[in-house]
Amino acid sequence: MKDVLERFLGYIKVDTQSSEESDTVPTTKTQLEFAKKLGEELKAIGLKDVSVDENGYVMATLESNIDKKVPTIGFIAHMDTSPDLSGTNINPRIVEKYDGQDIVLNKEKNIVLKINEFPEILEYKGQDIVVTDGNTLLGADDKAGIAEIITAMEYLINHPEIKHGTIKVGFTPDEEVGKGADHFDVKKFGADLAYTLDGGGIGELECETFNAAKAKVIIEGRNVHPGSAKNKMTNAVLVANKFINMLPENEVPERTEGYEGFFHLLSVKSEVETAELNYIIRDFDRKKFEERKEQIKEVGKKINEEYNKEIVCVKVEDQYYNMKEKIDEVKYVVDIAHDAMKAIDIEPILVPIRGGTDGSRLSFMGLPTPNLFAGGHNFHGRFEFVPVLSMEKAAELVVKIAELYANR
């Protein structure tokens, strides 16, 4: 029987970055290849009804070993890693019995995981921690989740004395580019409720996400020779700058926390003739979320009024909503996860997700899906790390949740 660390180290060797630019499903071929490998592994450990569809979704079943009817639960993780940093040739290192000091990730490039910048690592002093070599991300988001789920399923198969109902396993592509639930067949999956293992540090239990939208701002300028441009030229670069400055300067990711929302400018492409701004809009409160969408549209209207012509076009598109609306209808799914953590000596930390998970969309598709910790920290970057014990406890948590549903 493989342990969770062995699985994790094997999975991160496979580059499964998703792509913002691709229109294929999944967005990268390597995700489909990885999905097929996972499907074979699920069959090998003894799961039933294993399927890998053409879109890269993996599903499988662990059959009930009890007579009474209990809810069918699902455990879900995503296969892709973030496009934000390379996932090619990940070269992990295990820092044994971490001593509480700065960790040199790459001596040659002077890349150091410093405790004054990432103080949360001190919580794991004395533990074994998996880190990067400073050149890539680690992939704990979310291959730690995959390793934990499969390890838990194998444990349940090898320990039939632990009673459980029917359990569904699902692995999705393209979560990191917001498409993880696009082709997820909730009916085929067949669960009454589910949990994603896509959270951060040990103990995190999340049932709230942002409401999310994206906005594309197109600015049409007019280029005229600068020598004769007076009262003729409209410089789209300067209009773009005006637009940016008309949104609240403190309502940005780097100046907000907790339940505070924001406007996040992702990219700017501009020249005199035309400019394009790409934003994401986030807020936990549905009313404030709607107000933010109107606010960014209003900026465009004001600029058009100032120039007395339609030079700014703002297109806003919703992405996902705060899953709390749906989780609150079946609050016991959170209560059971809370009790399961307590039962294995983990202190639950109820926190809002300042982001989204597949569970955000799935909850609105009829599958209530709160999020559990996978154990990692500093996702999407070279300072990503995951304590080995956190992964082991996440696998143990999956087992305990299954057990509590059987005894419910």
Swiss-Prot record:
GO term, biological process aspect, one: proteolysis
EC number: 3.4.11.4
Residues bound to Zn(2+) 1: H78, D141, D198
Cofactors (names): Zn(2+)
Family: Belongs to the peptidase M20B family.
PANTHER family per record: PEPTIDASE T
Name under which the protein is recorded: Peptidase T
Organism: Clostridium botulinum (strain Kyoto / Type A2)
Gene name of the record: pepT
